[in-house]
A protein has these predicted regions:
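Secreted/processed peptides and extracellular or luminal domains of membrane proteins
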Residues: 67, 71-74, 224, 255, ...
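Short aromatic-enriched loop/helix-cap "lid" or pocket-rim segments at secondary-structure transitions
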Residues: 67, 115, 143-144, 169, ...
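Conserved C-terminal portion of the radical SAM core fold
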Residues: 96-104, 124-131, 148-159, 176-241, ...
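C-terminal accessory region of radical SAM enzymes
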Residues: 2-13, 181, 187-196, 218-247, ...
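Short, small/polar residue-rich loop motifs at catalytic or cofactor-binding pockets
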Residues: 250-252
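Short catalytic/ligand-binding loop motif for oxyanion handling, primarily in non-cytosolic enzymes
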Residues: 75-77, 110-112, 140, 163-167, ...
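Conserved alpha-helical substructure of the radical SAM core
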Residues: 2-154, 165, 170-176, 180
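The −1 position to Zn-ligating cysteines in a subset of zinc-ribbon hairpins
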Residues: 60, 64, 248, 309
């Protein structure tokens, strides 16, 4: 049985039986972490450490999705994070006892040329929750086995279409290939609880008519089926005529995002690139989490005195 949950910009359907079993299997520490993540007063007192670290392994993507700027990365700008930087990050994560690691923040993570070595290092992260998000195109058998062996708790595959024609139109990829990869992953996982499987569709004019077909296709296979609202960042240089703001953005209060080049950001949206906090090559996560830059940003959010970049983000505008 699938339950519907309205999460604002995300409309979610989830397998009640599977998610209940998964949550129970993850234990009481995990449940306490999730309660803290969803706490309505999370902005009142700054946590001593981020709840989650998001990590980008590459600067680029092998797909050409029409709604994503990663489709247009020049060859000279295609960069992959060094394995040693990942190792340094894992050391930081373990020292701070961060609860959650999310890999694949802004680009396609599984095309990293040393993805096997990266997963071996990430396996050493002592976290309660470990998520990988991918387009699924590079989810071959070897990588799928590595993901399962690394202790990943959640695998999230961005699909955006129910038919191969729409999939190619939106993503310029091969849906049959990706679905075969997912089916093999499910078979390799077998009766194990983890990783759970989430599939998602970013709703836009091109695919909205396939919502029901997408839902029916993935019921019985995916544990979570999400429909997301497309966030438009094209107007970032033009201040919106907005007079009311609500401090709904809790990103800098609960997570940090790390780019392929080691630069650390206070949020996982494209707007976050305007607020670099430092670099994991020479600064610890603890220093950046407690630093002046992020403290100033948090205060702006709490007092609704938003800077011109955040002022255009849907998380804080009405």
């Amino acid at each position: 049985m699938y339950i519907f949950e309205d999460r604002g910009s995300v409309k979610r359907y989830y397998s009640q039986e599977r998610i209940a079993a998964i949550t129970e299997a993850q234990g009481s520490d995990y449940r306490r972490y999730r309660e803290l993540w969803d706490a309505p007063n999370i902005m009142d007192d700054v946590l001593e450490k981020p709840l989650e670290i998001m990590l980008e392994l590459t600067s680029w993507c092998n797909y050409k999705c029409k709604m994503c700027d990663k489709a247009f990365v020049p060859e000279k700008d295609k960069v992959n994070i060094p394995v040693e930087s990942v190792r340094r990050l894992v050391t930081n994560i373990n020292e701070m006892k961060v609860a959650s690691l999310w890999v694949g923040a802004f680009s396609e993570c599984l095309i990293h040329p040393q993805i096997g070595d990266v997963l071996d290092v990430l396996k050493e992260a002592d976290v309660l929750d470990f998520t990988i998000i991918t387009n699924g195109s590079a989810l071959n058998e070897k990588t799928a086995k590595k993901i399962i062996d690394a202790g990943v708790k959640r695998l999230s595959v961005s699909l955006d279409a129910a038919t191969k024609e729409t999939y190619y139109d939106v993503r310029k990829g091969d849906l049959d290939q990706v679905e075969n990869h997912i089916d093999r992953f499910i078979a390799l996982r077998g009766e194990d609880m983890f990783p759970s499987l989430r599939v998602s569709m970013v709703m836009m004019e091109d695919n909205v008519n396939e919502r029901e077909a997408f839902l029916e296709k993935w019921k019985g296979k995916a544990d979570i089926i999400d429909f997301q609202v497309l966030m438009d960042a094209s107007h970032i240089e033009h201040l919106a005529d907005v007079t009311e703001y609500t401090p709904e953005c809790v990103e800098p209060f609960r997570r940090l995002a790390i780019r392929y080049d080691g630069v650390v950001l206070p949020c996982c949206t494209s707007y976050g690139t305007y607020f670099p906090l430092g670099n994991i090559r020479d600064t610890s996560l603890k220093e950046m989490w407690e630093g002046e830059k992020i403290r100033k940003l948090r205060e702006e959010i709490k007092t609704k005195n938003f800077n011109k970049v955040c002022r255009n983000c849907k998380k804080v505008t009405q």
